[in-house]
From Swiss-Prot:
Catalyzes the folate-dependent formation of 5-methyl-uridine at position 54 (M-5-U54) in all tRNAs. It comes from Streptococcus thermophilus (strain CNRZ 1066). One of its GO terms (biological process) is tRNA wobble uridine modification. GO terms for cellular component: cytosol. The gene is trmFO. Its main location: cytoplasm. One of its GO terms (molecular function) is tRNA (uracil(54)-C5)-methyltransferase activity, 5,10-methylenetetrahydrofolate-dependent. Belongs to the MnmG family. TrmFO subfamily. This is Methylenetetrahydrofolate--tRNA-(uracil-5-)-methyltransferase TrmFO. It holds the Pfam family GIDA.
Length: 447
């Protein structure tokens, strides 16, 4: 039940998530106070004062239902997403992707929200978290310092922090399990890591490729942040071979298992170097490359990291990225509704929750907005099915392992697997997952 006596809901931030949340609340007949500081205080990234501005790319990525983000967009269309609707109206040719005229699209979103009779737009910076009403905080990946500090305090001084790098994540089903082995260093605890052993020859070839690979350019607003964070693997490698062999590729305590039949240097019991893969989701379908945060171009990541034994044909569900970002320890702090566990009147949405990408941010705003509206009306919360893309995102960010939690794009690896024998053909498997998702979503909507 709602614990607020106010006759409106606050939404802080009019980016993709905040705009979507405000619209979803207002369409359910509830007044919204939408706060946006752009217009009175600029950010390093934004070029306009329009809502839902696309800062970097103008692409909403793949549009096919055999692409997880394509499935997510279709689900959002069926849920009347203001972001998807205006994006569709301002599409530009982009092959199999959905790209938009960024100015026309953002202007349309802004006009629709500003003209909505139930949405009051307030152009000012919020430095305190309102306690007068149910509130959705969607202040973006570079939340202003004052508000960031308040969120930090609200969460008990824990869980609102910066990251400068993320390592690539691969689909376990595409790892060659004949070339890797399960083991924890020195056999401590359960065998929790997949280990990719390298001979000296394999390591030297990999090292050469890594140190000569092309890095992605930094946006101007990222340059200062680049040097503040954890070190990219390619920068570490350029400090010398020993930096790698005594660092992320240290082989000590990771001896070959007795039944290992792959290549090795002579009769050595320990590989020359080892790349470790760590389980990344509860279902065990995703693994990240431990210590391999990177800022290489995506094509270079694929080329270089597929040199790792066992990853020759690996499918990367997320490439490594390097940029400063604010995000929460969502597994400990948020419910699957994007509602605060400690304050039921408070919701969070957007990249600060640990979803990565334009579409994912808007989707989180949609879920948070719907649930904020339901709380206002005294109705039960809704949790979208884990078989859908829009249900799998909040499930992932609230059920991931907190210690190693990092932002995530939507991908088929986080959606609940199909029942029955695994379909080997990837396209057919994804088609079946999408078919089930849309069917389950429609059943959910009709209920």
């Amino acid at each position: 039940m709602s614990q607020s006596k106010a006759d409106y809901i606050n939404v802080i931030g009019a980016g993709l998530a905040g705009s979507e949340a405000a619209y979803q609340i207002a369409k359910r007949g509830i007044p919204v106070k939408l706060y946006e500081m752009r217009g009175v205080k600029a950010t390093p990234q934004h070029k306009t004062t329009n809502f839902a501005e696309l800062v970097c790319s103008n692409s909403f990525r793949g549009d096919s239902l055999t692409n997880a983000v394509g499935l997510l967009k279709e689900e959002m269309r069926r849920l009347d997403s203001i972001i998807m609707r205006n994006g569709e109206a301002h599409r530009v040719p982009a092959g199999g992707a959905m790209a938009v005229d960024r100015e026309g699209y953002a202007e349309a979103v802004t006009a629709e929200i500003e003209s909505h009779p139930l949405i009051e737009v307030i152009r000012e910076e919020i430095t305190e978290i309102p306690d007068d009403a149910i509130t959705v905080i969607a202040s973006g990946p570079l939340t202003s310092d004052a508000l960031a500090e308040k969120i930090h305090e609200l969460n008990g001084g824990d869980g609102f922090y910066f990251y400068d790098a993320a390592a690539p994540i691969v689909d376990k089903a595409t790892i060659d399990m004949n070339k890797v082995y399960l083991k924890s260093r020195y056999d401590k605890g359960e065998a929790a890591y997949l280990n990719c052993p390298m001979t000296k020859e394999e390591f030297m070839a990999f090292y050469e490729a890594l140190t000569t690979a092309e890095e992605a350019p930094l946006n101007s607003f990222e340059k200062e942040k680049y040097f503040e964070g954890c070190m990219p693997i390619e920068v570490m490698a350029k400090r010398g071979i020993k930096t790698m062999l005594y660092g992320p590729m240290k082989p000590v305590g990771l001896e070959y298992p007795e039944d290992y039949m792959g290549p090795r240097d002579g009769d050595f019991k320990t590989p020359y170097a080892v790349v470790q893969l760590r389980q990344d989701n509860a279902a065990g379908s995703l693994y990240n490359i431990v210590g391999f945060q990177t800022h290489l171009k995506w094509g270079e990541q694929k080329r270089v990291f597929q040199m790792i034994p066992g990853l020759e044909n690996a499918e990367f569900v997320r490439y490594g990225v390097m940029h400063r970002n604010s995000y929460m320890d969502s597994p400990n702090l948020l419910k699957q509704t994007f509602q605060s566990k400690s304050n039921p009147n408070l919701f969070f949405a957007g990249q600060m929750t640990g979803v990565e990408g334009y579409v994912e941010s808007a989707a989180s705003g949609l879920v948070a907005g719907i649930n904020a509206a339901r709380l206002f009306k005294g109705e039960d919360e809704v949790i979208f099915p884990h078989t859908t893309a829009i249900g799998s995102l909040p499930y992932y960010v609230t059920h991931a392992e907190s210690k190693h939690f990092q932002p995530m794009n939507v991908n088929f690896g986080i959606i609940k697997e199909l029942e029955g024998p695994r379909i080997r053909d990837k396209k057919e498997r994804y088609e079946k997952i999408a078919e089930r998702a849309l069917k389950d979503l429609q059943t959910f909507i009709d209920a």
